[in-house]
């Protein structure tokens, strides 16, 4: 069985589980490329990611997940939280079978992920222009579990876990930077949610941090007034035009691309073309 089939076997007794949008499964793909025999480990890590999304949608009051109704929108916050707890609990139960080293790697990532969720909530209370704080938050919230997935898979395959951890960390951070960009550059149909939704939710993502550095005082004030506001079409166009004027999208994309090159260089000696392809796809995607 592949890891998605293992997950279905783990959770299919719960009716609500069948309505979850599982997504790309990038963590599972990375694990099974590094070690094709680690399908169960991939299922455990993907389950942890899934549980974090269930909780994340409740925190963000998100009605949509990948273009369809979120579990909290369909069944309510209580059900979404409890389903997330069930998925987390079963994942940790299964994690014990992989031994102490892998269990510590993955459980520490969940600790970091949870910290990242909390930091994200705190940073969303007001405009954050501190790049270091933002980068630390996205490392914890997004990259830490990808880093752990690659590190744990390396342990299971007998590879250098530090090199694969570095690969995972860098593509994880790059993945989030690209997500930040897509929220601005893509439309609702492509994203499966409204465009520029991050700024409405209070998230001052990397493109906005860089834009604030470049704007005149008058334009800074205008951008601040749009914070947490449901943006009109002309307001979205103004933001996009300003991003274009200062080359913000290109700056962020270049930063993500540099992280991808670091990721590929970290594991170059292992010559695993599929991991290079995934790394490149992280930055060359539309959703």
Which ranges hold each PLM region?
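Residue-level signal for inorganic ion chemistry
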Residues: 30, 91, 116, 208, ...
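Inter-helical turn/loop segments and adjacent helix faces that build the functional surface
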Residues: 93-105, 124-137, 149-164, 184-188
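Divalent-cation-assisted or electrostatically stabilized phosphate/pyrophosphate-binding catalytic cores
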Residues: 19, 65-89, 128-142, 189-214, ...
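Transmembrane helix-loop-helix
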Residues: 92-113, 222-229
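Conserved N-terminal diphosphate/IPP-binding helix and adjacent helical/loop segment
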Residues: 1-73, 120-129, 189-190, 260, ...
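Short glycine/serine- and small hydrophobic-enriched flexible loop segments
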Residues: 32-36, 89-97, 151, 155, ...
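Active-site alpha-helical segments that house and flank conserved acidic catalytic motifs
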Residues: 39-63, 111-112, 143, 147, ...
